């Protein structure tokens, strides 16, 4: 990890800008300002902005940031933010998992989950794709999501056995390998594939990989408009990220060499036709597979540094908006890229950390030897 030194002058500059940025949750586009800042300065600017404003963000966003910062740094102060996430998802798992045997519950809650997809172009495409699989959203984006996160923290959640039984009885393969589904949300599907294997309810990896490659053959890249090209690249990064337990473990590059080779060959189009979060993930894909010296990493870093706006102390959205709630994802990714550690940290296993152990929700039970278990 870089040794990040800050002069007093820089610190006061950042602090002053942070105080200004605390009111910057702009809904209107902001004009980005050019700069000559270093990677270190960009890293600290984003960090100061996010951590100053963290408690104004939704619990889900606080948890997302804290989990990733713990896995990058191992600093236990980030365990408290992760605890906020656990408290939230444990209550939700209790509601969903403990009602699975209630007549009509799966059908009604699945419909609610689908309705939340929205009515924009992407939401409509996803609703159309998921129509043949009416219960898939509940199984995947609710049950698998919450159970896998509880598991990552070293616990089993409420009504665990009923949830596992329900998911084992649900054949997710048709939805996961459907071409329209992959075209609608490739990255999310590989997440579901990983989570299903993680909690022991099904191994869909090879089937999904084959379906993904058939959906996006490299020979037909020239036929992909920007939206579909972004979806392809985003999906490819998540093959690697899911294999890492989402930044908990280094990844053997051999299984994913087909992805790394593709990124290296197509980096110029990736930099042109995708967005900052996807571009940053491409760079991280090389770092997490031990390929930090690959020229792609330097290209991505230069792009990300140039995308930083010093006035708002963040990387703006593709539409130029400075909303921290929706922009935390791309900005914490930028932090990770610019200060990648020598060692990744598992968990956090909240039952093993003094500051969180005494505040755990009663709804979860510690797993045996969680800290000694590789979840995948």
Regions found by a protein language model. Name each.
Residues 13-14, 24:
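Cleavable N-terminal signal peptides
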Residues 26-119, 132-152, 162-172, 294-376:
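Terminal, non-catalytic domain-edge segments
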């Amino acid at each position: 990890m870089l040794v990040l030194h800050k002069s007093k002058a820089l610190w006061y500059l950042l602090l002053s800008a942070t105080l200004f940025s605390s009111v910057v949750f702009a809904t209107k586009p902001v004009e980005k300002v050019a700069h000559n800042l270093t990677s270190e300065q960009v890293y600290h600017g984003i960090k100061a902005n996010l951590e100053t404003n963290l408690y104004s963000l939704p619990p889900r966003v606080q948890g997302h940031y804290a989990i990733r910062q713990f896995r990058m740094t191992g600093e236990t102060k980030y365990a408290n933010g992760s605890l906020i996430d656990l408290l939230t998802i444990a209550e939700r798992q209790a509601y969903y998992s403990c009602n699975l045997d209630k007549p009509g519950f799966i059908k009604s809650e699945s419909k609610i989950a689908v309705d939340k997809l929205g009515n924009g172009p992407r939401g409509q495409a996803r609703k159309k794709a998921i129509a043949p699989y009416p219960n898939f959203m509940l199984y995947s984006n609710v049950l698998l999501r919450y159970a896998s996160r509880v598991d990552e923290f070293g616990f089993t959640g409420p009504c665990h056995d009923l949830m596992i039984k329900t998911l084992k009885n649900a054949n997710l393969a048709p939805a996961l390998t459907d071409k329209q589904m992959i075209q609608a949300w490739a990255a999310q599907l590989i997440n579901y594939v990983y989570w299903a294997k993680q909690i022991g309810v099904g191994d869909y990896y090879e089937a999904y990989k084959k379906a993904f490659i058939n959906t996006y053959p490299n020979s037909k890249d020239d036929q992909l408009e920007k939206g579909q090209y972004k979806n392809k690249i985003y999906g490819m990064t998540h093959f690697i990220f899911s294999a890492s337990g989402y930044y908990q473990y280094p990844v053997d590059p051999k299984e994913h060499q087909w992805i790394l080779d593709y990124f290296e060959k197509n980096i110029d189009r990736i930099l042109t036709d995708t967005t900052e979060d996807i571009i940053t993930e491409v760079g991280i894909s090389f770092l997490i597979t031990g390929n930090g010296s690959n020229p792609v990493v330097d290209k991505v870093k230069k792009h990300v540094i140039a995308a930083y706006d010093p006035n708002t102390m963040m990387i703006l959205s593709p539409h130029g908006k400075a909303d921290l709630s929706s922009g935390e994802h791309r900005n914490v990714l930028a932090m990770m890229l610019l200060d990648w550690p020598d060692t990744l940290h598992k968990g956090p296993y909240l039952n093993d950390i003094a500051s969180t152990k005494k505040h755990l929700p009663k709804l979860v039970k510690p797993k045996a030897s969680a800290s000694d278990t590789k979840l995948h």
